[in-house]
Every structure is written in structure tokens, then in C-alpha cells.
């Protein structure tokens, strides 16, 4: 059977923990955060050429705050039988480039996880299934939509609150298919507690992700034009 997850999907013994530097990053934090209008980013998730689900991020403004709603839906079938399901719901609140709060729930093939992050002064309070405590307030969650994550040495799990130690290596520009067109994208390799590759376009927007599942199969995120309505609703 196949078990995988790019950080949100990281579990000891079942996953190749996956699910994110240069002056070029200085202006890329604007990416999705500073696009302004309500908008969405949508990925089809593929395993070895088979579509197994989706990952969607919806961005909206409320005054000075940016809200990011995230939904992941995955299902793996074998001989018409579902052998794996994964559902993740997450809401982030940002202001001025700082994470104020994040709350997520996950059903990882029947195993439940949750995490609540809240800004407390210069720190971030973490209350998760696998970790509870305080961390520096500039620590980013493993939701990957900010290219700024590629400067991080530590990330906090958006699934269960664990702290991941990572090393990120920039690998240069490549052509990547994003929403039906080829774009130049910066490629990064993330290794350590997480093991995956990510790509960001000239505006700093996340456009691709790949990693190997524990069975050796290739999992790939392909960015596509978003459907009008999030499947399954917000789930918050």
C-alpha cells in the first residue's frame, strides 16, 4: 500500500517525510500575500501518472488581515477499493507579513491530528497533537505558499505542530507548466526532516511540488486553473 504526505502527511514509519538564500527572495514574500484581491491557487495531485486528489488555497482580505483557507483531499484506489484517504483543513490569518493564527484539522486515513498556532508577543504558541510549547514568532508553517519558507532552517508542522529541521538548496531556474502555460520558476531542494522539491515563479508564487512516497512512487503537484468553488466547502 501507499502512504505519503508532504509534511501534513508526515508520520514516522509510514511516510518519507516530505510536506518547504538568495537575494532573489528579498521581494518574493509579496507573492500570493500581496496580490490583494480574493483569489485561489489550485493543484492537482498525481501519483505515477494517476490523479489522486487536489490541494487548494483560497486567499481573502478582511481589513488589514489576510485569510488563507487550505483544503487537501486525497484518495488512492486499488482494484476499485479505496486503500487510502487523506483530508486536511487549515485556516491561516496574517497581518503585515506575520502569522497571527493558524488552526488545522487532519484525517490521515483514520488517524486524527490538529494544531493551533497563535502569536503571543514575539513568540508563537503551538498547541498540536505532537507538540505543545512556544517557538520564535517568525517560524513559518509547512504550507509552502510563501517562497520565504525557502530561507528557513526550521518549520512548524501545519498538521500536528512538530518542529522540523531542514536545509534548503537553490537549484536555479526551470520551465514549469502552471495553469496551462510555461513559466520560469526557481527550483529548491528541501532536505532534513522533510524531503521534497518546490518551485516558485517570478512573482514568488508556488507552482509545483514533488516528492517520493515511502513506496518509492513519485508524487507531484501540478498547478492548474482553480475551480470556482472549493470542493467540500471550507471545512472550518
Functional labels for PLM-detected ranges:
Residues 15-26:
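Bacterial N-terminal signal peptides
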Residues 2-17:
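Bacterial N-terminal signal peptides that target proteins for export
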Residues 31-121, 127-130, 135-236:
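Acidic, serine/threonine-rich low-complexity disordered tracts
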